[in-house]
Amino acid sequence: MKARAIVVTSGKGGVGKTTTTANLGAALAKLGEKVAVVDVDVGLRNLDVVMGLEGRVVFDLVDVLEGRARLRQALIRDKRVENLFLLPASQTKDKEALDPERFKEVVRALLEEEGFDRVLIDSPAGIEKGFQTAAAPAEGALVVVNPEVSSVRDADRIIGLLEAREVRENFLVINRLRPRMVARGDMLSVEDVVEILGLKPIGIIPEDEQVIVSTNQGEPLVLKG
């Protein structure tokens, strides 16, 4: 994937978007890239918790957007893996505090001034201002989808909005696949999801209780063992 600014989105909440962002960011950092993961879910931030960094948040994205903090002040370096940084969302503001144009400048600064190789943007669920802000600087997208009808339907809507914004380098992450349910005809197959949505899967992730354990422990699964 060539895109450097990538929005991780879904439409439907609870499909594993934040977990995907955290693990992909950690994996890319382990491969040697300098990575910033950015939480745009203002008012409902979780990326800091999933990464085990919630106790180190001093400034946040809205502080940067509104000029109360410099970008470097708000970035939190992960001590477990070199070159992985978090820009957390605000817990106390609402999404009206977001400004898509100013957010584009923040992402530009991360790439051009701070020297990041990749910026992963954790989008809020839905298609309102939070999504619009998260998608504004994106060159590509990872659409996280569960193999169920409601998730696929919402993902289809999101893909249309991304294409309307000329975000073209888009891929699927099919999460929480249960092969036994697929075999019984109780869950959509990978082929079903790909045919409906028309995007190539870049990752297929089976249901795994270790993901829940690692999330509760604040340690991305790719950093274990």
Regions found by a protein language model. Name each.
Residues 5-70, 118:
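Walker A/P-loop NTP-binding active-site region of P-loop NTPases
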Residues 164-225:
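C-terminal lobe/tail of nucleotide-utilizing enzymes
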Residues 153-168:
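Conserved C-terminal guanine-recognition region of P-loop GTPase G domains, centered on the G4
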Residues 115-130:
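Glycine-rich phosphate-binding loop used to anchor ATP phosphates in small-molecule kinases
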Residues 40-114, 212-217, 221-222:
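P-loop/Walker-type NTP enzyme "switch/lid" segment
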